[in-house]
Amino acid sequence: MSILSVKDLSHGFGDRAIFNNVSFRLLKGEHVGLIGANGEGKSTFMNIITGKLEPDEGKVEWSKNVRVGYLDQHTVLEKGKSIRDVLKDAFHYLFAMEEEMNEIYNKMGEADPDELEKLLEEVGVIQDALTNNDFYVIDSKVEEIARGLGLSDIGLERDVTDLSGGQRTKVLLAKLLLEKPEILLLDEPTNYLDEQHIEWLKRYLQEYENAFILISHDIPFLNSVINLIYHVENQELTRYVGDYHQFMEVYEVKKQQLEAAYKKQQQEVAELKDFVARNKARVSTRNMAMSRQKKLDKMDMIELAAEKPKPEFHFKPARTSGKLIFETKDLVIGYDSPLSRPLNLRMERGQKIALYGANGIGKTTLLKSLLGEIQPLEGSVERGEHIYTGYFEQEVKETNNNTCIEEVWSEFPSYTQYEIRAALAKCGLTTKHIESRVSVLSGGEKAKVRLCKLINSETNLLVLDEPTNHLDADAKEELKRALKEYKGSILLISHEPDFYMDIATETWNCESWTTKVL
């Protein structure tokens, strides 16, 4: 029996259709990968099945009493609560049961023998439920999940409103896993996780007995935990049994078969039309022409989906920089307290350096310190001459009400509208996306708008903080190619070895200089 059933679903935003009469089912224990290019509607689908969005048409039916857990990175965390408090909120229904049990105990003092027996039965039922749901080992469960996702390193007594976006996501994911719902809905859970914690989450999901729906552009991760694919493309939702690689094989075969059938049909249509045109006027052949016309009219025409624009990234070079990019002398980074021991680092022209290591140890802080956005606690940074820097930040917090055209135009006022549109199209954005406000775009589309601005700026140093977060497989592959081709210097933070190992001329393990206990 289906835990979730979606029938005849259609939805769109304005004149932009997202889904057209699609169906979906989820059975107990299925591990589903929901895949598709940026902007095809994966997150929209999640919002519809969780009731955050009302579909234009169609039915969404959950089986009764099913508990659904959704990793929503926009959840507001209550000020004044510690990480531990939020994680223990996962068991709020058990604490409510304990409260109910304590109230029953209070009633026992005044109960007659018959009432007492009834109350003891009620207490027994609650006691069993608490025991079966690990109520008496909650603290150790919280500690176990917190360790697995690296929250213990941050400190469980820390106020949740002081956390970075990545740390907030970890807290929300940990709470969700502690809730153990019948269904997990995970929208890009690895975006803010480092390699160690991605590996932990991978093992957790591989052993997860219940069902989940996972959106992820990290293909090795996705492939290791799913047994079913739903592919979102051209307003359709198609089911494939197997992992991502098996899906790609079947998808390519189906695509080739459809193209061959389309070509054959187009040839037949051309021949029929030609026959009708040549023979409809003659009395002797008019009946045959009418017969061919009827065949044409009844024909189910095969339609090929319009090819989505593939991104093309070509970074504009600035003049050659000096030999030195930067050199640090006894640099100590941090805000209120040190995040590093004194650092003596040097980068020279042409180097492509990937920084890796656990979350929260100061990788982003190091980048901002090298760029001069944060003052060091101690030591100094010497920057080279003729450096033209392009900086891609991991998080952009402010709401952006510009259209994509306005956003890029504000950076390049000398461009014509045609040039702006062409630049955005080269980043894989369609006309509908280009004319939309940045605030309504998906995470991947927003990243492409930011990349568009970076690509069209003249640079000889790229500083990139997790640039692949939210990018679909095509965009990620094209970005990798463009960075390998780039003639300047690169300083890159990434949690994906599959991405950075092909680009980097050397890697720096930031765990070797952090003051954090790992």
UniProtKB/Swiss-Prot annotation:
Residue numbers binding ATP: 36-43, 357-364
Source organism phylogeny: Bacteria, Bacillati, Bacillota, Bacilli, Bacillales
First-level EC class: translocase
Gene3D superfamilies: P-loop containing nucleotide triphosphate hydrolases
Name of protein: Uncharacterized ABC transporter ATP-binding protein YfmM
UniProt cross-references to InterPro entries, sorted A to Z: AAA+_ATPase, ABC_tran_Xtn, ABC_transporter-like_ATP-bd, ABC_transporter-like_CS, ABCF_ATPase, P-loop_NTPase
Residues annotated as domain ABC transporter: 4-260, 324-518
PROSITE patterns: ABC_TRANSPORTER_1 (PS00211), ABC_TRANSPORTER_2 (PS50893)
SUPFAM superfamilies named in the record: P-loop containing nucleoside triphosphate hydrolases
GO molecular function, one term: ATP binding
EC number: 7.-.-.-
